[in-house]
């Protein structure tokens, strides 16, 4: 019986126990309906979670009405959440598919905790796993992308990976259980559906058992991936710093390309970008590569990895306090880098806080000649990322302070000074000077 196969799979993969509460993700489609009916018939305690993404007009409401009826007839507690998926996708600059995925899994986990469920059960099956392998191959992937869908990912479990789509449909027909059909699954519209409706039928002409062959291959690769991931984990410890990747250490590894892929691919960098990054390792610093929310900057000795903040900051991430004092023999000039001291009588123009820019010059404190800010920062071995984050305080057109770094000699205090201006960095996330 199909129940025995699913029960054996749950036990083999240690997905959950009979006394655990299972939160079943219920779309109303054949797969999720079969999952709920199977688990209930096997004696598991289930609650259901349904998402209404409002993407398919009347179909979305039809699906909700169906799962309400199904859960009512089955005596299953149902939880429903409505999402403005289009607005979320627009705000986050992601696809509708990705938006729906993020929204539903975030809500599933929140609901799981609220309901004290042990796991979230999704209805992925063998065919889904095969499609995932092919999709990853088409996009470009590492060894982990060839493993297909795994039985467990944290609190998310997939009890139906032991079944094919055909077996699921046959089971529903056997128990005379209806379900709803998502019309988009029948349209050659999304990439996964192109694989399902176009590519796989062609592959089956070459090998009628192609799905089973792919599943067997993923199982063989799983053991190899375990060893591979252990080696990658050890390599990460050798090459990574809090700022990024040590280039020299990476190049000493036996497979630097594979390590680079495993570090950067999860951050949204595709295979072409990673190849381009690899080719810059021996080159000059300065190149910037953008992933999805992250960027890599080729510096002298490091590949700097940081969140993408390329949009120009309109305000500095700190607050300055300006105070004026009489300059007497008892006055002690502060020495820390977060404080600047100026001769007040040399300041007769408005002040401005801004990012430094190419061509900026100043006279570093203690020197007599002008120096380009870019050269100063390079001499101080600032990384490219640190250079981008450097702000300056200007009086009129002249730079008075590389904030947090060094003041300009033209505004220094001397024996003729009568009044001093003290400027201090006192906190983050503000945009003005207090006087």
Swiss-Prot record:
GO terms for biological process: tRNA modification. CDD domains: TilS_N (cd01992). It is an enzyme of class 6 (ligase). ATP binds at residues 27-32. It catalyses: cytidine(34) in tRNA(Ile2) + L-lysine + ATP = lysidine(34) in tRNA(Ile2) + AMP + diphosphate + H(+). NCBIfam families: lysidine_TilS_C, lysidine_TilS_N. Ligates lysine onto the cytidine present at position 34 of the AUA codon-specific tRNA(Ile) that contains the anticodon CAU, in an ATP-dependent manner. Cytidine is converted to lysidine, thus changing the amino acid specificity of the tRNA from methionine to isoleucine. This is tRNA(Ile)-lysidine synthase. The gene is tilS.
